């Protein structure tokens, strides 16, 4: 039994599977006699904040810390290091954020409260998308995985910018000043080539608290901390950034994200009507994810190649790009996160229907994306195809 559990957690798709299980459990509990207890638990106050608040502002800051680490590593030595390798996923990511937002706005332009959710379908759930792709194993070319990873990372970076610019509340000058001071200390530690992680974590904790009190969303502190962690250690030492990234990854993939899904996907269907489910808000989100994502990513990718701005990755064709662009319509955790910010100060009904739209669009995108990849990829593992050609 222990071997089965160990093998499961070694699977690339394990994180995505746990997300689905956590969301399904949350939906089941929320619509059972335990629904009131579930909501009461999430709204229980611990050390001055509700459990839900701790998950969304506290634990998700660790997730954004991991994003910061991944983005920095990719920029310095990975798929985003050179202009040639970064330009293609960067252009695709821009299209993948613009088109869904425009579709949502087209559906909700007449509603001044709903319009604030324009960024909800612009996000991609990197863990979920990579998990679906991992189900196809070695049939997926490495270059296609790198494209999806780079695209999703740039997408996440775009979401961070959107949160900072458009979903910030009333600002506290004093807290902001403390936050800027702690940011300066973090990068001073980096400049002084401090490679021990403890000082970064102490200063980072103060930064998180300052940002929490400033009116800017606290999760952004995680990204700043991630960018401050040094990639290279002192001579003969391991990389502090890679060490932290590898240490955090299992906790984020198998703990924080499933817990976030459990806390946020538990939508009570009581009072939900078919007319509400087919209203402009959920439809704008679902179609933004399901139609806008592939439309934007594929169109911008195709145009970039045809105009000579970028080249297709080796071993990848436009059918693969389209399949991946559909897969990027899985907004799930990131879209739910933005929804919680966008509709924090309006009727709870907005957030309920938004989350249902996210679940509809993300689930459909996951199924269609998987089917497209299944039929467009080689039937044999990439390594087997290569060895047969060389034989």
Curated annotation (Swiss-Prot):
<feature type="transmembrane region" description="Helical">
    <location>
        <begin position="205"/>
        <end position="225"/>
    </location>
</feature>
<keyword id="KW-0406">Ion transport</keyword>
<feature type="transmembrane region" description="Helical">
    <location>
        <begin position="47"/>
        <end position="67"/>
    </location>
</feature>
<keyword id="KW-1003">Cell membrane</keyword>
<feature type="transmembrane region" description="Helical">
    <location>
        <begin position="318"/>
        <end position="338"/>
    </location>
</feature>
<dbReference type="GO" id="GO:0015385">
    <property type="term" value="F:sodium:proton antiporter activity"/>
</dbReference>
<feature type="transmembrane region" description="Helical">
    <location>
        <begin position="252"/>
        <end position="272"/>
    </location>
</feature>
<keyword id="KW-0739">Sodium transport</keyword>
<keyword id="KW-0812">Transmembrane</keyword>
<feature type="transmembrane region" description="Helical">
    <location>
        <begin position="14"/>
        <end position="34"/>
    </location>
</feature>
<dbReference type="GO" id="GO:0006885">
    <property type="term" value="P:regulation of pH"/>
</dbReference>
<feature type="transmembrane region" description="Helical">
    <location>
        <begin position="171"/>
        <end position="191"/>
    </location>
</feature>
<feature type="transmembrane region" description="Helical">
    <location>
        <begin position="356"/>
        <end position="376"/>
    </location>
</feature>
<dbReference type="InterPro" id="IPR004670">
    <property type="entry name" value="NhaA"/>
</dbReference>
<keyword id="KW-1133">Transmembrane helix</keyword>
<keyword id="KW-0813">Transport</keyword>
<keyword id="KW-0050">Antiport</keyword>
<dbReference type="InterPro" id="IPR023171">
    <property type="entry name" value="Na/H_antiporter_dom_sf"/>
</dbReference>
<protein>
    <recommendedName>
        <fullName>Na(+)/H(+) antiporter NhaA</fullName>
    </recommendedName>
</protein>
<comment type="function">
    <text>Na(+)/H(+) antiporter that extrudes sodium in exchange for external protons.</text>
</comment>
<keyword id="KW-0997">Cell inner membrane</keyword>
<feature type="transmembrane region" description="Helical">
    <location>
        <begin position="87"/>
        <end position="107"/>
    </location>
</feature>
<keyword id="KW-0915">Sodium</keyword>
<dbReference type="Pfam" id="PF06965">
    <property type="entry name" value="Na_H_antiport_1"/>
</dbReference>
<feature type="transmembrane region" description="Helical">
    <location>
        <begin position="280"/>
        <end position="300"/>
    </location>
</feature>
<dbReference type="GO" id="GO:0005886">
    <property type="term" value="C:plasma membrane"/>
</dbReference>
<feature type="transmembrane region" description="Helical">
    <location>
        <begin position="146"/>
        <end position="166"/>
    </location>
</feature>
<comment type="similarity">
    <text>Belongs to the NhaA Na(+)/H(+) (TC 2.A.33) antiporter family.</text>
</comment>
<keyword id="KW-0472">Membrane</keyword>
<feature type="transmembrane region" description="Helical">
    <location>
        <begin position="117"/>
        <end position="137"/>
    </location>
</feature>
